[in-house]
Amino acid sequence: MFRFETLNIWHDAVAFAVKIFDYTETLSNEYKFSIGSQLNRSGLSPSNNIAEGSGSESAKDFRNFLNIAVRSVYETISGLTVAYKKQLITEELYRKLYQDGETLSKRIRKFRQTLSP
C-alpha cells in the first residue's frame, strides 16, 4: 500500500475529482473540451499532488505539494464559478461542489499544519 492511500485527505480529494468529472460529463461539446477539460485537470490535481507529495523525502517538500493541492482546489472553484455565471451548472450543484471544495481545502491545510517544519 502506498502512503497516500492511508491519508483521508487523499480519499476526500479523489471523491472531489470524481464529482467534478461527473459534472463535466454533462456539459455540451461546446464546453466539454474547454472549461470542462480545465475543470477536470484542476479537479484531479489535488489528489495527484497529495499522492506525489506523500513520497517526498522531507516534510517541507510534502508541505509544498499540499500547498499546490489547496491552490488547485481554489482553481477548480474559480472555474465552477465561471460555469455557474454562464448558467452551465445548477445553483444546487454549484453550492454542493463549492462546499466540498471549501471543506477539502480546509482539511488539507489542517493536515499540512501537522507536518513538522
Language model: regions and residue ranges:
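Amphipathic alpha-helical assembly/interaction segments
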Residues: 1-117
